Amino acid sequence: MQDVVDAMYGVVNEGGTGAPAALPGIELCGKTGTAQLASLDKSKAEAARHGMNLKENAWFVGFAPRRDPEIVVVALFDHGGVGQYAATIVRDVVKSYFDKKTRLQTWNQERSTTVAGISFLRPPTAESRTR
């Protein structure tokens, strides 16, 4: 299993097709892919008659952090063509998750107080709720 995790890490962080998903400070691992549309040639001909441009579906699955993952995200981008486009969507979701986690940890640390070795959270103030 570790070989698979290492390979997925490389896809994102070592110049692989998932490089657009890389995030500084977060070990995101992932895999790009495409899914061929059924009868793509026939569909393209039909789409061209209607002024549409059909491409293969693109997907990306990613998880973070590399060790002890907390989040898994899959993005499927209809007619995206290549998985790199879906990788940027996953990157943004993972970044939002860790940004929010950091804000919550900071907020809780600011509210905590310790009495006799026991940690308590003070009730939030109106000011602290606006952050």
Predicted segments — roles?
Residues 5-104:
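Active-site beta-strand/loop architecture of penicillin-binding DD-peptidases
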